[in-house]
Amino acid sequence: LKDWDNVTVINEDILKVDMNQLVKEYNQGRPIKVVANLPYYITTPIIMGLFENHVPISSITIMVQKEVADRMQVGPGTKDYGALSLAVQYYARPQIIANVPPNCFMPRPKVGSAVIQLVRYEEPPVQVDNEKLMFRLIRASFNQRRKTLVNGLKNSQELDFSKEEIEKAMAETGIPVNVRGEALTLAEFADLANAFNKLR
């Protein structure tokens, strides 16, 4: 690439480097497009690091394990629905562009792959007063996904709400006390986070 004057190779660990500083230095702070074939075992930390650190991004187009790509775009009530689904869908609109079968690689892997594009929202699709609280609620809801939402939140190490506070917040948002977290939409998690935020 040395003959290309519009290419800069940066030898850094993406999980440690200050991406906001790189975008500021090399792209004058304008939104960038991320295109990558990510190491499958660190896909989630990379994506969430870009989103949670509010790196100016217009889109992310990546090849990932097919199972992970599916998790990013599914909705409530499915076995693949979880914290990653909600986080990605809060920040971006996911769409699988292509499935890549194992026979496209040499040596042939044991898992399928997919190219997925995440188009960043200018504004999140839901209004939430405290993002960090919402994501703590989401993680707590799926850490013990077979438990009811009340028990999952009450037993969470990340939260310190009493059972009474949890039931009050759920009543205010119209969420049944016997529901599991895997049944809630992103909008319902946002409403619940806003209700909890008013309690403290």
Describe the predicted segments one by one:
Residues 1-136, 182, 191, 195-198:
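Catalytic cores of RNA-modifying enzymes
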Residues 25-27, 107, 157-160, 170, ...:
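Glycine-centered secondary-structure boundary/capping sites
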Residues 29-33, 164-169:
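Glycine-rich, flexible loop segments associated with nucleotide phosphate handling
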Residues 114, 118-120, 126-165, 173-176, ...:
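An accessory alpha-helical subdomain
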Residues 170-178, 189-195:
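Amphipathic alpha-helical segments that form the core helices of the histone-fold
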